[in-house]
Amino acid sequence: MGPRARTVCFLFFLLWVLAELAENSDFHLPGDYLLGGLFTLHANMKGIVHLNFLQVPMCKEYEMKVSGYNLMQAMRFAVEEINNDSSLLPDVLLGYEMVDVCYISNNVQPALYFLAQEDNLLPIQEDYSNYVPRVVAVIGPENSESVMTVAHFLSLFLLPQITYSAISDQLQDKQRFPALLRTTPSAKHHIEAMVQLMLHFHWNWISVLVSSDTYGRDNGQMLGDRLAGGDICIAFQETLPTLQSNQDIMPEDHQRLVSIVEKLQQSTARVVVVFSPDLSLYNFFREVLRQNFTGAVWIASESWAIDPVLHNLTGLHRTGTFLGITIQNVPIPGFSEFRVRGPQAGPTNQRSTCNQECDTCLNSTLSFNTVLRLSGERIVYSVYSAVYAVAHALHSLLGCDHSTCTKRVVYPWQLVQEIWKVNFTLLDHQIFFDPQGDVALHLEIVQWQWDLSQNPFQSIASYNPLQGRLKHIQDISWHTINNTIPVSMCSKRCQSGQKKKPVGIHTCCFECIDCLPGTFLNQTEDEYDCQACPSNEWSHQSETSCFKRRLSFLEWHEAATIAVALLAALGFLXXXXXXXXXXXXXXXPMVRSAGGPMCFLMLTLLLVAYMVVPVYVGPPKVTTCLCRQALFPVCFTICISCITMRSFQIVCVFKMASRFPRAYSYWVRYQGSYVSVAFITALKVVTVVISLLATGLNPTTRADTDDPKIMIISCNPNYRNSLLFNTSLDLLLSVVGFSFAYMGKELPTNYNEAKFITFSMTFYFTSSVSLCTFMSVYDGVLVTIVDLLVTVFNLLAISLGYFGPKCYMILFYPERNTPAYFNSMIQGYTMRRD
């Protein structure tokens, strides 16, 4: 005997022991094809019956559940409606066998009863392909733990099972449960609807309470996994003790409830998510009322989201706002009247089983009928659609047309294949099973109301599992002062432009710190760090974006620019006048003593240098930068080198020619002055080229250290570092020129240029050193204007300081610009030396 046969044999033994006879037409209806129904009419939360107990629990000994009877009535209503429908299963009568499963206590015996044949025998066979059990399909039960227990039995025979409210994602495993389907969205959609609700109201600090059974543990774990690393944090999670509302509470369980409620009181989290069966919550909420815990937002899982008995608990409305996640309401015409209709008169002669009695069900339902009627048909529709799914599958399997069906034996494996294929419209809703065996019904967020004139479970929003978001969110009557939305945050939301500094282990607990100037907060990328603005942008403190810095450069309308331009124009005119005066007296001794042709070279370069001044104004370009960094320095260096060589040549004539006649003759013969100027010019060109290669010509920008909102655009990004290198040759020439001028202070008056050269060279040396010092300590917007001003002053020092006195002598003392006068001055100098 194989393992499968031994298993079936054992089940047969249990079935033979557990079977008994009871008659009640409320639970049984004969028909051509029977449906099995498993409902919780009474609930036993603690008394779990194990397989080694050979007595079936008597469900009527436990507390009655109105909602369970309401669902059983939905199945009866659907079967009766189908039997009266001439278009669906014409000429075929559906029957049913329904059993009370006591929540989780009575699952095995009904499963065996449904699997057995009419004689209560379950034969041992090698092949069950042609086996016909008592029922063709089973509707229920309601909770995931019971569904899995029953499914393990039914799946051995591929007997179709459709659950109407079990949401565990474990039920999607078709390797374990190939014949199991459900007409309710899976747990992940319920969890996601909760999360979207909390995100909508900015609740990021919550408490979670779970029951100690599989339902509570699994859903609590799923919620924790969904929230891990997200925007919502769990302040704490506690496990509720398993309690029966009509049983005396044990001291340890009571102390546990007291501790949990005290923890809720002390927590700053005002939103409480509860995953638990309804019967486990009665004593808990009694303790909540006893401790006067108010102002909370209770988010109910689908297991108690629309429970009428818990809703009727006295004073419950004082504890806060109740929001529940449940299946959408689909009104079923005629069901409200059918729900309170009594059982059919007279016993039946058909064989039934135990736990098919509920003496108080109808009266209890009548007492809650108003609440049930106003709350609408939610899970009721899931039962209703499950029955219709089986009916449509049978309709297809029996080859029915509009008037007749071919009645024949229906095997479970055939029917389950047809159920997977069904696709029909029921009360304007499309019913079909996805690859996981679920029907994608919408979910609703309901608010509990205690005004008898309103729906006790008022819909405030809907959730589409296919879209994954809430919609049609309505106003909520908050149980708070001034009807304000409750706040449940570990930390208040940061203001715009503030970064989060984590506090503790929860991501929802943080300090808010302002972003510093020059940084901004990009919340889409990183809420915990301020990002630096790009180099050409800036921001104030606590900003979420940067703005463009204002580019700073010399402009013509500025007063400083106009003043410097006027000085440059004055220098240009003076240099042009000096060139005209020198050209008019080109053969005169005064011009020849000033350098002759070299004098015209200097004046020409000075004019060019003055013409370069305007390129300092306006935004720098490659061409203007080339003029600033190459053309002007070369021109100025040639001018200084000419002055230096002129000083050296005069000293040579009067003091060194007699001592070194041969050297002097070589100097004169090979034009030593021009060769020296050419060499110095070449050296300057090399210096400029090296500087340009090191720094480049492209204009660059830098932030103003005094005003970060300003971006200074300049030619040389390392101007301060290269300034001393670029001017080193000029400074050396100025020192040498000053030295030669000082050596010639005793020369004839017409050749004594010590005062003028000393003035020019000293001014240049002092201004250049001052500029280097200034730029080493300051890097603001004044650098360019100071640089230009020093440049113009240096040009003026040469133009006016060196050429000015000579022009003055040519214009106002022409008698001194004669060869005779110069010869007399030389003779006087010679006589003094002798």
UniProtKB/Swiss-Prot annotation:
Glycans are attached at N84, N292, N312, N363, N423, N482, N522. Keywords: Cell membrane, G-protein coupled receptor, Glycoprotein, Membrane, Receptor, Sensory transduction, Signal, Taste, Transducer, Transmembrane, Transmembrane helix. Forms heterodimers with TAS1R3. One of its GO terms (cellular component) is sweet taste receptor complex. Putative taste receptor. TAS1R2/TAS1R3 recognizes diverse natural and synthetic sweeteners. It comes from Cebuella pygmaea (Pygmy marmoset). Gene3D superfamilies: 3.40.50.2300, GPCR, family 3, nine cysteines domain. The chain crosses the membrane at residues 562-582, 598-618, 631-651, 677-697, 723-743, 756-776, 780-800. The gene is TAS1R2. This is Taste receptor type 1 member 2. It is found in: Cell membrane. Its main location: membrane. It comes from the Eukaryota. It is a multi-pass membrane protein. Residues 1-19 form the signal peptide. Residues 583-597, 652-676, 744-755, 801-834 are cytoplasmic.
